Amino acid sequence: PRIVGETGGKDFVVAHPDCDRQGLLVALLRGAFEYQGQKCSAASRAYVPSSVWDAIRDDLVSEISKIKMGDASDFTNFMTAVIDQRAFDKISGYIDRAKSRDTCKVICGGGYDDSTGWFIEPTIIETSNPTSESMVEEIFGPVLTVYVYDDSDFDQVLTMCDEGSPYALTGSIFSSSEENIQKAYNALRF
């Protein structure tokens, strides 16, 4: 017999200061929140240089505020409920714990409601701790955690990303430089 296993993922996005900022914004938005973040390839942790984060943060939050959530049979909705009560409880628990930590700040979303379905707002957590729970553990929901790093620390961030989670499914590198992409590829390949 043959077995193909799909295992866990804590998929990353690593951005370099020279990246296409609009492309990064779209990738974060769609990568983290399509299918309510309940896909194995969902972008759930991002390492973004401070100059880039300062430039895209408000626009990203604005775009997320426009996401329409509701019934899955209404195809005008971008997001719908998460799969079940267990998932709802797990995801909302991560959000609540992030809200209580000094190193984490929920900058958009963070709300949830299970009165009719299991709805969780698309949520971004900004953290100053690259090993915070929401950066390293698989949440499997509409939660993106962003670690903002000093623009000069790209090499160190590659090491953080590589060592930051036991999962190794997919990841994305954003840079306009082939040299930086190759450097990231070499550091992050499994």
Predicted feature residues:
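ALDH superfamily catalytic-core signature
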Residues: 1-130, 151-163, 179, 187-188
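Cofactor-binding loop segments of dinucleotide-utilizing enzymes, especially the Rossmann-like FAD-
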Residues: 176
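Active-site donor-binding acidic/aromatic loop of nucleotide-activated sugar
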Residues: 145-147
